[in-house]
Amino acid sequence: MEIKSKNDIIDYFASGIKQDELIGVENEQFLFNIKTNKRAEYENIKKLLQIFITKFGWQEIKENDNLIGLKFNGKSISLEPGNQIELSGDKLKNIHEVCVELHNFQKELDSACFDTNLTNMATGYDPVTKLKDAPNNPKERYKIMTNEMPKGGELSLNMMYQTSGTQVNMDYSSEEDFKKKFKLMCYLTPLAIGIFANSAVYENRASGYLSYRAKVWQNTARAGLPKIFLELSLIHI
């Protein structure tokens, strides 16, 4: 998208207005080889994805003839740069439906992991693997990001290869609704980081943070917002 004026930005957000106000959740996890205690390599991941296809009916997603993800009934499975596996959930009405969706996926993932000698770890930061030893996969976008991201943040590669997390996507019904939800989420994010902090360890030693993931994401090229977004003069909640 080429931005030529302020209205281009306004129109982009206006085009996203929805009346149903659904939510969707993206959930990432690390995968480890239980025989080596190391992160799963791409060859391991391909076998895991094949289990989802043959056992649970998922459909493959390929790039340059490489298996890089799956799709099924509004959901998709994709790989992050360090082979973190991500479920991008369907558009749902409430968190109860999200909970059911995630539990169903976890059952399938546990079964596929058992068949491929893998195990999952749902932490914000890989507690044992050094960055130089993190695995990768053949997605073209990640090759570009690996070269470009460090130019804008000293921990950008750590963010790409060593972190996992949960993202919540929410519809908005109007410009006013967007402003209220956006500002509220800006305020709630630090609280969520504190409540769900589970990444105090990295490279087998204490990081000095309860959430080292949060520390890493403050030093990347793609995170953070100007303080103007929190100015009280913008909107009252």
Region roles according to the model:
Residues 140-195:
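Internal, well-ordered domain-core segments that constitute the primary functional module
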Residues 235-237:
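Conserved small/polar residues in nucleotide/adenosyl-binding loops
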Residues 108-112, 160-177, 204-215:
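Short secondary-structure transition/capping segments
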Residues 79-85, 134-138, 169-176, 218-229:
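A broadly tuned preference for mixed-charge, low-complexity surface segments
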Residues 116-122, 190-210:
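Flexible helix-coil linker/hinge segments at domain or subdomain boundaries
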Residues 127-135, 201-227:
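Short, conserved secondary-structure transition motifs
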Residues 1-154, 162:
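Terminal catalytic/cofactor-binding subdomain
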